[in-house]
Structure formats: C-alpha cells, structure tokens
C-alpha cells in the first residue's frame, strides 16, 4: 500500500467479505502504525452523523501523509490513515440533501477522525463528497478528492487567484509557477489554473514531463521545465518565460530539496506570493517581503466548508463535462495488506 509510486497515486480495493460479517454490523479496517505497519482489525460499521455520508468503499487512495504521520508522530497517529475513497452511498446523515443511498461518489474523509478510508465503509462530510458520473470509474474517483481539494485551496484560498467562474480575460497574462506539476496535487492545480485561464503556466517537473505536456497549452506560453537541470538553469528558464513580466504567484507542491528557494529567487520581491505544502517547516529563509503561506487541506474542515462544497460540485461537473481528468493511478494488489 505504501510503496513509493512516482507521479502516480496508489489505490487499493477492499475485498468483499461474507454476508455474515455485514449482518453483524462489523467491517474490516486497516490500522497504520510506524514502520509502516498495517494491522487489520474488526470494527463497527460507522454511522452517519448530521451532515455526513457513509460510503461502501470500492477503492481507497493512498497519499504520502498516510505513512508519514505515524512515522513522525508514533502512537499518536496510529489509526486508519486513509482519507481518499470511492464507492456507493450507504447512509446519509441528518441535513444531507445532495446525496442519496446508491449514489456513485468519491469522497475525502476528515483526517485524524474515525471512519477513515482503509476500511469497507468510510465517513465523509457532504461538503467533501463528489458525485461521480458513469464515465468515471471508482478507481479514478479514489485518486481525486484529497489532491484536488488541496490544489483548489492553494490556488484560490491562499494565492487568491481568479476562480474558474470568473476566468482571466484572454488579453491578460498572469504567470504562475507550479513546482511539482506532475504530482497529483500539481496536476490538479494545472487543470484548475487552465479553467481560470491563467497563463503562462510555468510547470516544474522531472521524469513525468510528458504527462504535464499533455495538460498545458503551449500556444498561451505554458512550458515545462526539468528541475533536474539545477537551480540556476531552472531560474533562468523561468525568467526567460516571463518575457520581462513580474512573477507574482507560485505554488510549490514539493516544498523541499531547494524548490522554494529557487522560486523565491525569481518571485517579485515586493508583490510575490508563494504557497507551500509542508506545514512542519518554518521557511524562515524566504525573504520577509514575499508573502508566504502553507496550504493544508484540513482548512476545508475549518473556515472553508462552503468553499469545499462549491468545489465538490464543480469537480463533479468537471468529470461530467470531461475537462477534469483523474491523476494516473496504480492499483496495489492485496487490498489493505498491499
């Protein structure tokens, strides 16, 4: 389950259990601890509280934080760490009107709470649950919520870029650097930025550059730069693609190994904004004149609940209309034991 899958999101499929187990109102659930180690236990099938949805899970998506949290925090983070899943609605809680039993959905579970995705049934809030059209498979669906919500938070809540419903006019250029554009979070950021008509997109990637090339629009100045060329070469290529324009916005979906330092060398030192994704770092070496922020998807459960609800609807429509594409997946065999 936790093997490193470069530029692909790992998904796992729970194996069906007997009707006797289901009738007993229990399920199998995977508990992740330091190592990482996975222990399969029997747990009660969760109940939907007010505003919640319980999903019978077909696929669960794995994210790097699923093993990092137990590794860093030990017993405090020993729990069902899964936060991405897809399947059919099993139960809806009080006040939920957008979903009904049997609906095909993808959902993001609230981290550090019971009812995680590494189980036969998982819990999500209605505002982080996405309707899946028939053309989107459950496997694809499990690769969407966590990364897509993170990308939306970065671009619109942190960088305050124009929303897709109010796209930039064709005669206006807003350069945006996306470092880690071939990652799951990065590739959803690219797709969202395009819907906002934000160009040129200056995408930084490595071996998966072809994946990024297929998403961007070269006719609008979009480009992919290989970070393996080194700090100076990347900085020079970013500058060259700006054509003399100031760089105001950057999303660093990697936030390590010199990525944000390279970006900050090119960002405008007076109006530049950068958002990063590793909350444990201080980023104290970023110049104080540059506005920095850290994007955490947990913010959708705090002051961005309606923001998340709006994007849940938008993502569902994007899948239906065909412009939103799931990040490439790799299915790990052996259900949660994989």
From Swiss-Prot:
Coiled coil: none annotated. The keyword NADP applies. Disruption phenotype: Leads to an enriched product formation. It is an enzyme of class 1 (oxidoreductase). It comes from the Eukaryota. Its EC number is 1.-.-.-. Substrate binds at residues 147-153. Keywords: NADP, Nucleotide-binding, Oxidoreductase. CDD domains: enoyl_reductase_like (cd08249). PANTHER family: HYPOTHETICAL OXIDOREDUCTASE (EUROFUNG), OXIDOREDUCTASE, PUTATIVE (AFU_ORTHOLOGUE AFUA_8G01420)-RELATED. Trans-enoyl reductase; part of the gene cluster that mediates the biosynthesis of fusarubins, highly pigmented naphthoquinones responsible for the coloration of the fruiting bodies. The non-reducing polyketide synthase FSR1 is responsible for the condensation of seven acetyl-CoA units to yield a haptaketide. After rings A and B are formed by aldol-type cyclization, the PKS-derived product is released as 6-O-demethylfusarubinaldehyde. This is Trans-enoyl reductase fsr4. It comes from Gibberella fujikuroi (strain CBS 195.34 / IMI 58289 / NRRL A-6831) (Bakanae and foot rot disease fungus).
